[in-house]
């Protein structure tokens, strides 16, 4: 008696999957208002992770370390020593123009 051992193989090759190929969405961090720029109260000055730039005069810090203006005025970025920076907002005097 003749016994045959018949093996069938897949006719399509199995395709492996990669563990790469995805990326996180950008967080849009950075300076939003430049030095000398006029800002309104509530405007965001800097979006950051951690206190890379510290809040100065008339500047608040949000829960995610975002710096924002507390008053209307002009933004000024200043150095604190060698390695620290701070952002301040100084009030500007508005001159009223009277039409004659």
Swiss-Prot record:
SUPFAM superfamilies per UniProt: Ribosomal L27 protein-like (SSF110324)
Name the Pfam families for this protein. Ribosomal_L27 (PF01016)
Domain of life of the organism encoding this protein: Bacteria
Instruction: Fill in the PTM field for this protein.
Output: The N-terminus is cleaved by ribosomal processing cysteine protease Prp.
Keyword terms: Ribonucleoprotein, Ribosomal protein
Mind telling me which InterPro entries this protein's record contains? Ribosomal_bL27 (IPR001684), Ribosomal_bL27_CS (IPR018261)
What Gene3D superfamilies does its record include? Answer: 2.40.50.100
Q: Tell me which GO cellular component terms the UniProt record holds.
A: cytosolic large ribosomal subunit
The UniProt entry's GO biological process terms, in alphabetical order, are: translation
Q: Which GO terms describe its molecular function?
A: structural constituent of ribosome
Propeptide part(s) removed at maturation, as residue ranges: 1-9
Protein family (similarity comment): Belongs to the bacterial ribosomal protein bL27 family.
What PANTHER family does the annotation carry? LARGE RIBOSOMAL SUBUNIT PROTEIN BL27M, RIBOSOMAL PROTEIN L27
Q: Return the protein name.
A: Large ribosomal subunit protein bL27
User: Which source organism?
Assistant: Clostridium botulinum (strain Hall / ATCC 3502 / NCTC 13319 / Type A)
What is the taxonomic lineage of the source species?
Bacteria, Bacillati, Bacillota, Clostridia, Eubacteriales
Name of the coding gene: rpmA
């Amino acid at each position: 008696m003749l016994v045959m051992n018949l093996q069938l193989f897949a006719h399509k090759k199995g395709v492996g999957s990669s563990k790469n190929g995805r990326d996180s969405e950008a967080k849009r961090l950075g300076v939003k208002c430049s030095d000398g720029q006029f800002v309104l109260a509530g405007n965001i000055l800097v979006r950051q992770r951690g206190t890379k730039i510290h809040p100065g005069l008339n500047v608040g810090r949000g829960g995610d370390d975002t710096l924002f203006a507390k008053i209307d005025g002009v933004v000024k970025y200043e150095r604190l020593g060698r390695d620290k920076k701070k952002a301040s907002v100084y009030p500007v005097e508005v001159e009223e123009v009277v039409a004659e």
